[in-house]
Amino acid sequence: MNDKYSTTEGKTSEKLSDEAMLSAQWKNIDWHKAEREVNRLQIRIVKATQQKDYNAVKRLQYLLTHSFYAKALAVKRVVTNDGRKTPGVDGVLWNTPAKKMKAVLSLTDKGYRARPLRRVYIEKKDKKKKRPLGIPTMYDRAMQALYALALEPVAETTADGKSFGFRKGRCAQDACEYLFNALSRKHISPKWVLEGDIKGCFDHISHDWLLANIPMDKNILKQFLKAGFIYQRELFPTEEGTPQGGIISPILANMTLDGIEKKLVERFHTNALGKVDLRFKNAHKVNFVRYADDFVVTAATPELALEAKELIREFLAERGLELSDEKTVVTNIDDGFDFLGWNFRKYNEKLIIKPSQKAVKAIVSNISDTILRRGKAWQQDVLIMKLNEQIRGWTNYHQSVCASDAFAHLDYVLYELLWRWAKRRHPKKNKWWISTRYWHRVGNRNWVFSTENKELIRVDSTAIVRHTKIKATANPFLDEAYFQKRKFDKGMHRLTGKFKMIWKNQNGLCYHCGMPMDVTEEREIFYLAPKAKTGVKDVRNMRYVHCACQRIYAENRLKK
């Protein structure tokens, strides 16, 4: 009897010891070194791709996907992103340092079999329809993240120059600037635009094409593609499309669509000798800009735009894709068109880019929902915090275009909605009581919706700052200094006051990991000493950190 108990206690003690050791290993990973080591291999993959040495590419990809540091970064990405608390079909979560370290050590291509995705349906923005979402297991997510590290250098090196979606260091504002350059010149710029819409791009890409053309381990890729999904306890196979909700899916989709720009250049910019000829380029005025599966083609005449449409249709057909005839239309620039949430239109030969009506309606709808439905019982400071998050996100996206009128309109809408919110909370109070309860004078501003600690952002105080477009040929793995400077400059333009000072003091680098931060991505303030000791507003005590790095830091402190 005693022997039985001692054996059980011994196993429990051994298990606890193993967990403690794994936990310590996870906490002691040097993430800065991990980034450096993986980046070194990625640079070698880029150079091998440029030299078209595909055997070297394959060999280096193998080294990277079997590297400890690459596996650690893959697991880190999975356990720090927004889906870290959502399990796949196996119900497994990596929510302790020991489980995370065990995952790093268990990632392998040997005998790998991807589990089916867990299918759920989520509401679309218009709330009338629901769209399907596939949730892979944590292990499959980590495998995708690992192989994405090896595939991304190839994708970046072979990508179209005017492709901006789901790519390192590129954004919608870059696409906007390239379109501005193509369309803004008086009497010279192209008059016609082909607005492209691909039917269910991510869902219909041919598996045969992907397996034949994507430079990565074919067995692993096949597992990603053929995993299937489970809905209401029934297994459904996947015969086409990229892994839904998968980390690697945007890279696969981009690589599928890369080549459209080259095809258009060959047809409209080259002479009989196959060389780019400025005479043809200037006569046809064909330009191509793509963001993920949305694209625009400019042309001198509607006939050229339709010819470009047929070339793109042929290109897509080889990949199992097709254009939507209803949504792929040729438009005159004087009538205007919408792209990436902006409206592009010429008024008396002057190009104006502003937030589209659809984008304005969407933010008004979201704010209305926050104030009148979700926030009807919130305290004022909670409501202010939630609204400021929405306002900052929207204004940061649109502040590089002619958005002053839209910003002023949003201020007016906010006032009307907040007055309804306040009136609903105090139906028996008069206007004077409500106004003095919720609106105050702050500095030289009257009627500020505020509390003692928080105040609502004034939307039209957002400065309009022209975005500096990226070099089309820039590679994030080879031109690291260029991309780091762009990130730093973007922060200096967008931040103000103490936040700008913190950013400048750190040179835009994360305090925890030392890697560059992007001002448009998630970040938070880390306090070196407790706020109670130094005060909330002491800049010397404040540092910017990646949210992911802060989660790991907080977790490690908690476990200690």
Language model feature labels by segment:
Residues K226, Q232-L235, R319-L383, E389-R392:
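A conserved non-catalytic segment of reverse transcriptases
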Residues A24-G83, L149-G165:
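Charged boundary/loop elements
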Residues K498-N507, G535-R540:
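Short, flexible, mixed-charge glycine/proline-rich loop motifs
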Residues V413-L495:
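Extended C-terminal regions of large enzymes
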